[in-house]
């Protein structure tokens, strides 16, 4: 009886539609929401979303591919089929700060143009609640260094954030405010610091120097107490403090924002900073050396990353999210470092085991035949999403691997090259991408023949 009543309670929660669900934060949010009983529709612009995302969501999740926020008609169809007035929408489709600096026009089309299209689709079906991830990139040089709040952004609408990235985030907040006025909407936003993951899923954001250092830690050493030639290269001033949040704390904060009673949200525009940790590179490196005493680094400043690092606040306020959302961070710097390094060690162990499985002649090197045999045996057999595309994806995948890993072009992949590649890649995820590409090509060929594809 107890189990039945709990099931009914969980299934009664309104649906959550996530746009941009295949990113690092999106994947974790999908899994966290379904774990709390929310029915989740995960959408992204790629035609086929990762099988790992569907498995993480289970029966409460639905994956919808081929949804680009810049495509008004596709978005409208998505909302007509999967959303109503009770649906909560998350718009996570946006490039990173450094990516925006490199191509502001494209970033604006995705960030602000995408938000405008999402809000139009919401109005079309009567959806009210939208949650948006803002960023510390919205704060400029005039912002307080400590105790920064989302309220400050509201009270200083004309401050210069110092980047196109920050201007575009401000534009999204303005669009949501207009949506609230014109359609009685319930927009909410969370100002995020740098997000720290235990998985190797990050991109090229400014705060991700910390994850790069943690990833490099087991492989960097010093010589006579000085950084070796291959020491980790720190792209920002090692004494600059920046706010961060570990992904477990972040999920708690995002879900608290989504589930909060509208009447309890007292901050302007229902915006809240989600604080976590705050540390300098030097403080991080001290903690890393407790695990790897030989960790070495050299400073080689990246102009864009260092500019942002010096521009943003040192710390975010904890008062408002605790008062209205019941959120406060739990993960310390020591906890975070131990967690991330432990995850890397587990991944390294799995990598070593996979290499040993493939290295059937125990030479410490891999041939193309050995790699393809492993992929077919362990990654394809019994996986419907791979097998239905035919076996062509496997050969193309192995060709791609050999092109990347056979550095000497002698048909051999060394352990060093394979382990380095595996730090940032998953063979299963890479194979999935290749399978999706092959399936898309098959669909296109079938349409060109005048038929409707069924693969």
Please give the residue ranges for each predicted region.
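Primarily EF-hand calcium-binding motifs
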Residues: 350-363, 390-415
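Conserved Rossmann-fold NAD(P)-dependent oxidoreductase catalytic core, especially the SDR/UDP-sugar
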Residues: 91, 116-164, 188
